[in-house]
C-alpha cells in the first residue's frame, strides 16, 4: 500500500505539476513536447529509484509506458474531440494501473504512514487533476470560450476552495463548509440573476 500510494503521488506530481501549460498545449501535436513531458515526468521516479537503488528496468517501463499511453490519448483526442473527458479518465486509469503493477514488485521502507500519504495524495488530486477534469467536463457541456485571464482566476479560486473544504472535512468542521457555500452564493447573487439559466446550471 505504501509503495502504490508513493508511486501515485509521484505520478500526479510528474503528470500535472511538472507539466507547464505550454507543454500541455503543444503535446497535442505529437511533437518534441511529448518527449519533453515524458522526460520531465520521470524526474520524481528517477530520484526515487536513485535513493532506494531500485532496478532501472522498472523506471524504463514506467517512462516508456507513460509516453506510449500519452501518444495514444492524443491521437484519440484529435479524432474524438467530444469524448475528451472520457479519454482523459481512461488515460489516467491506465497510467495508475501500470504504476500499481510496477509498485507491487518493490518493498520500500517509507517513514510516512498510509494516512499521511493518502492526505498528501488527496490534496494533490483536488487541485490540478480535479481542475483539469472539471474544465474538460464543462468544455463538453458548455461550448462558449472564456478569456485566459478569466479562466486562470476561476481555476485558482477553485484550487483554493477545494483545499479549504478538504481541510475542513479533516478537522470535522462540516458546518463551516455550509457557511462557505452560502457566502459564495450570496457574493455571486448578481451573476445568478443576470444569467439565470446558464449560471445556475454551472453552479449546480
Give residue ranges: language-model regions.
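Hydrophobic core segments of alpha-helical transmembrane domains in multi-pass membrane proteins
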Residues: 3-12, 55-67, 117-124, 175-185
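Interhelical loop and helix-boundary elements at the membrane-water interface
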Residues: 12-38, 69-168, 187-204
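Helix-coil boundary and interhelical linker segments in multi-pass alpha-helical membrane proteins
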Residues: 1-5, 45-59, 101-118, 169-175
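Short alpha-helical packing/oligomerization segments
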Residues: 162-182
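Short hydrophobic alpha-helical segments that form membrane-spanning helices or hydrophobic packing faces
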Residues: 22-23, 44, 102, 178-183
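Generic, well-ordered alpha-helical segments
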Residues: 31, 35-43, 51-60, 64, ...
